[in-house]
Amino acid sequence: MSMFCFQCQETAKGTGCTIKGVCGKTADVANLQDLLLYVMKGIAINSLQARELGIVRQDVDKFVMEGLFATITNANFDNARFVALVREGLALRDSLKADIVKAGGVLPANLHDSAIWTADSAEEFEQKAAQVGILATENEDVRSLRELLIYGLKGMAAYAEHAFALGYEDNSIFAFMMKGLAATTDDSLSADQLVALVLEAGKYGVDVMALLDKANTTSYGNPEITKVNIGVRNNPAILISGHDLRDLEDLLKQTEGTGVDVYTHGEMLPAHYYPAFKKYAHFVGNYGNAWWKQDKEFDSFNGAILLTTNCLVPPKDSYKDRLFTTSVVGYEGVKHIPAREAGKVKDFSAVIELAKTLPAPTEIETGEIVGGFAHNQVFAVADKVVEAVKSGAVKRFFVMAGCDGRMKSRDYYTEFAKALPQDTIILTAGCAKYKYNKLALGDIGGIPRVLDAGQCNDSYSLAVIALKLKEVFGLDDVNQLPISYNIAWYEQKAVIVLLALLYLGVKNIHLGPTLPGFLSPNVAKVLVENFGIAGITTVEDDVNLFMGA
């Protein structure tokens, strides 16, 4: 076994990748990610002690946030970047220890190895990485709970990073990241204590999504009902993918008046719903579908491509020289745009200059799709929605948020959407929408049957909408609403969304296309018995189950 990773839905055989990641990451990169996590656990241990002494280092918090984000599925495949991050982490950890001593603190004599181990060479890193991976925790249930917590923290870090880019942060979220990471080194914690920490992660998941919602809406306005073009124009263009709206804003400013159009891809589609971006005439529309189709769609786009966050798949040679990464994203041999300097826009001139020399996109479809149904927009038409429920025109809502992916079994979600009765409405967020957002599913009294709230973090909007409906209908429990949850997951942001929903009291969530490989039988049993978590079966049986047939 040259590596072990089971953090994503597509993990080999549903149990773990051991030679190379299904995502495309090499064993070297997987092991360095394990080592980076180990170093960050040591940083977290020291950070907790520093915080008790009133020492809060933003550089340390930012490093851990970005380090967690860099290890998310399909974010960074660059060996050299992880070697550099491990070195940076060790230096930050040791400077934090020096601050503790300077402030009169006494470092514990029995510090965990992650807080004291040090090395500098790539060879030493490789040796240590082999000792500190996931399987270093021998107890299957403890391992499962620790990894569930870590994957929740990774998703939390991603959302915190997006908010941070817009100038929004919350010290309590950073403090919990440290608490959670440090807890995964504590062998004295019982399974019940780890379960409690996992649920506490759900609380901070709600907090971080609320923070990001505030950051996005304060910066760019509240999403509104919007028709998005899916065709192309005959101009050179840049395709922007990922989730980072600040990067999009910088790119739109710099491309204005250059003759270069900008299109979104994948999870960047919901940017079109924000009022602030509608003033850009060269912001043309959305090109293509979910992340996993990029190997074909990046080819036919012809222009320059910018990856602001995950999801990146190992690029084909046919477009690799047109591809740029930024932020935590990386791939060996792909050009990387450095971080923005304080008070300045990020410099995308290299992307723009290349785009000018390239042909216009090849058209792959035409028409429009509709979205923008985040909480503020839905509240604006709340009377209509409530009346539709009271009159019986709408019998049930289906939350089908989450992720898309490569597996053929995900066609289930397309067929499920088609099979739902005409008196039902789908609430969605995340790239799971691409399984049904181009189907002609119609409307109910002018309300579209697919209401897209936005990116995966906008699952927060769906939770806010559910809580508002609970209030409007005078119910005691959110589970009394005519809402069913049939969620597709893929990576770690879906994990924090799930934990957030559990924290809010939502029960009977169906998760697919398979249950996470990192859930041990006993941990899965806890989730089933306490929260009603279930998998999916067939479209017909599941529709009948949800509709109470």
Curated annotation (Swiss-Prot):
Major enzyme class: oxidoreductase
Modified positions (Cysteine persulfide) in chain numbering: C403
Entry binding sites for hybrid [4Fe-2O-2S] cluster: H243, E267, C311, C403, C431, C456, E491, K493
Record keywords, A-Z: 4Fe-4S, Cytoplasm, Iron, Iron-sulfur, Metal-binding, Oxidoreductase
Cofactor binding, note field: Binds 1 [4Fe-4S] cluster.
SUPFAM superfamilies (UniProt xref): Prismane protein-like (SSF56821)
EC code(s) of this entry: 1.7.99.1
Binding sites annotated in the UniProt record for [4Fe-4S] cluster: C5, C8, C17, C23
Subcellular location: Cytoplasm
Catalyzed reaction equations: A + NH4(+) + H2O = hydroxylamine + AH2 + H(+)
Cross-referenced InterPro entries: HCP/CODH (IPR004137), Hydroxylam_reduct (IPR010048), Prismane-like_a/b-sand (IPR016099), Prismane-like_sf (IPR011254), Prismane_a-bundle (IPR016100)
GO cellular component: cytoplasm
Pfam families (UniProt xref): Prismane (PF03063)
Any GO BP annotation: response to hydrogen peroxide
Family in the record: Belongs to the HCP family.
Protein function: Catalyzes the reduction of hydroxylamine to form NH(3) and H(2)O.
Name of the protein described by the UniProt record: Hydroxylamine reductase
Annotated source species: Desulfitobacterium hafniense (strain Y51)
